[in-house]
Amino acid sequence: MEQWEETFNVVFHWILTASAIVGNGLVIYLVIFRRRLNSTANWFVLSLAVADFFVGATFFPYQRVCKSEPCYKRHIHWLCVDVFLCASVTNLCLMTVDRYIAIVKPLKYLTIMTTRRTLLAICAAWCIPIVTALLPLSWTYSATSPANKAISWKVFTFATLIVYGITPFVFLPLAIVRILLIVRRCRLERSAVMAQLDFNYSGLRRNRQLDPEKEISSTRLIVCVVVMFLVCYVFGVSVRIASVFGHQQPPESVLVTSSILILINSAANPVAYGLMKRDFKRELLKTLKINNSSSDLAIEEVL
C-alpha cells in the first residue's frame, strides 16, 4: 500500500471513529436525560448505542496501538474489541425481536415486553458476549500444550462464527421479511377499512384520520439498521470464515474494507435514529435549539 493510501485510510478511520463516538454518545444522552424517550423500545436502542459507542472507541484505536504482531494477542483482542462487536450483534438481534413482537403481536406487546423481561433481555445481550470474551483465558494461561491451545482456538473461532456471524445473517433477513409482509398486510386491511368508511360515511375520514406514521417509521428504522448491518458486516464474516476454513491470510484490501464498513455501521446507526424515529428527531432538534416546526418541515421535505 502506498504512503498516500495509508494516510488516507488512517484519516478516514479516525473520522469514522469520531463519528461513531459522537453520534452514539448523543443517542445515549438523549435516551437517558430526555424523559419522553424513556420507553421500552428506546431501551433497546440505548443498549445498541452503548455497544456501537464502544466499538467506535476501541476498534481502530486498538488496531493502531497493536499494529505490530508482537503486541497483538488474540485473547486481549477479544476482551478489548470483539466483545463490543458481538454485543452490537446481540443487541441488534434483540431490537429486531422487540420490533417483531410489537408488529406481530401488538395487542400483547405490553404484557410480553414487561420492564423485568426487557432488563433481563438486555443483560443477556451483554452477558453472552462478555462470557464469550472471557473463555479464551481458560486455555491461554493454562498449562495445556500449544497443540491443544491451537485446537481450542479453532473450535472457539468456529463456534463464535456460527453464533455471531452465520446465525444473525440467517435470522435477521427472515425476521425483516416477516415484518414487511405483516406491515404490508396491515396497510392493505387499513386501506380497505378506510375505503369502506369513505363509502358509508362521507366526510368521516376527513375528520378522523388514522395515523400510521409511527408504525411506518418504526418499520423503516429496523429495516434500515438491519440492512446496514448485513451490508457492513459481510466482509467481516467473510474474513472470519476465511480464517476458520482457509490457510491464507485475506488480502490487506479486504481487511481494510472490512474495518471501514464496521465503523460505518456503528457511525450510521445514530443517523438512522435521528432521521427515522420521530421522537428522536424531535428531542434532537430541541437539544440543538433549532426551531422544531420549521426544521421538521425541512427534514420531512428531504425525506
What do these predicted ranges mean?
Residues 1-6, 33-38, 110-114, 149-155, ...:
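Helix-boundary and loop/linker segments of multi-pass membrane transporters
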Residues 2-18, 40-112, 154:
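Extracellular TM2-ECL1-early TM3 structural module of rhodopsin-like
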Residues 13-17, 30, 54-69, 81, ...:
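Helix-to-loop junction signature of class
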Residues 17-20, 46-56, 86, 117-134, ...:
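Alpha-helical transmembrane segments of multi-pass membrane proteins
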Residues 32-36, 64-72, 107-110, 137-145, ...:
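Transmembrane helix-loop junctions in multipass membrane proteins, especially transporters and channels
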Residues 50-51, 181-236:
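Intracellular effector-coupling site of seven-transmembrane GPCRs
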Residues 65, 84-94, 101, 105-148, ...:
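Fourth transmembrane helix
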Residues 168-175, 220, 225, 230-241, ...:
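Seventh transmembrane helix
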